[in-house]
A protein has these predicted regions:
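Active-site neighborhoods and metal-handling regions in enzymes and metal-associated proteins
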Residues: 1-296
Length: 296
């Protein structure tokens, strides 16, 4: 956890997705070790003390969390340094994924002596590829969880469309959208983007008042209790009706979306789908006089 404005008032903690995939526990202060050479896994972390129990209540021990995840061994955090030291003495390769949290970077520096500025380039490409290969194939339970996330996202977007009207603020709509995610016991996949300024890539909701004749862009998604996410973007008129020009441009986006669905299939490269969509979009924008030149 990380302090928001002082140590005990923290940002909401969200467990790392790859850690969740392989080990499961959502609590902070844990490290997962996969020892391929010795064919064993360990869940490492310290049990919470009485001060934490007063605030959060009784929670599972690290041993119990490991057992629940099917991990046979657990150890306190101090053991992690011993494991790393022994591996380095034996000249074994220690693989880790690119860190993105500063406390993790400091921990890697303490354990392995790799400066935070060098850690991304020192991260294991072999491990990255192995994780990507495994996580790219979804089992049925995962597919159901993704569909659950999409259903939450659908409710978020339709709520945005319903409450958007001239005179309300972007903040109001954004708050209503976020409330949908929270009400399903979930959270937003990322900070909700809702703005009349669609040209700004990450336009967070402001106190700007929505105006008739403008377009509102909503980019949001929900994250389930099991941390699978949805992410959709929709653009719609503030007053509920497109102008002719807006409709012409919007229809291009709709046709590009339909083309992507039509040509996407096993064996087709994502890049090829992307380029075919770009060609269609460019040709249609040229027809409207909004682009010029050779499509290719």
């Amino acid at each position: 956890e990380c302090g928001l404005n002082y140590e005990d008032n923290t940002f909401r903690y969200r467990q790392d997705s790859t850690f969740l995939y392989y080990f499961g526990p959502k609590r902070d202060g844990l490290v997962g070790v996969i020892d391929v050479d010795n064919d064993k896994e360990l869940l490492i972390g310290n049990d919470i003390d009485i001060d934490d129990i007063v605030w959060y209540g009784s929670v599972d021990s690290v041993h119990d969390m490991a057992e629940h995840a099917g991990v046979k061994e657990s150890a306190p955090m101090k053991q992690l340094q011993v494991i790393c030291d022994n591996a380095m003495k034996e000249k074994r390769t220690i693989h880790f994924l690119p860190p993105y949290r500063h406390d993790t970077m400091i921990q890697i520096f303490d354990l392995l002596g790799i400066h935070p500025s060098k850690q991304r380039e020192a991260a294991s490409v072999e491990l990255i590829k192995a994780v990507v290969k495994m996580r790219s194939t979804k089992e049925q339970q995962e597919i159901e969880e993704i569909e659950r996330a999409c259903a939450i996202g659908y409710k978020m977007h339709t709520t945005a469309m319903r409450v958007t009207k001239p005179g309300v603020t972007e903040k109001y709509v954004g708050g209503q959208v976020n409330g949908i995610a929270n009400s399903y016991g979930a959270m937003v996949s990322f900070p909700t983007i809702f703005s009349q300024h669609g040209e700004i890539m990450h336009g967070n909701p402001s106190m700007a008042v929505l105006e008739s004749g403008r377009l509102a862009l909503c980019d949001c998604g929900g994250e389930t209790m099991e941390h699978y996410c949805s992410d959709n973007t929709r653009t719609f008129p503030v007053n509920g009706k497109f102008t002719q020009r807006q409709l012409e441009i919007y229809s291009i986006v709709e046709d590009c979306h339909d083309l992507a669905l039509k040509i996407s299939k096993p064996g087709v490269k994502y890049f090829d789908v992307h380029m075919d969509v770009c060609r269609l979009m460019t040709d249609r924008l040229k027809e409207l006089g909004l682009m010029m030149g050779d499509t290719e």
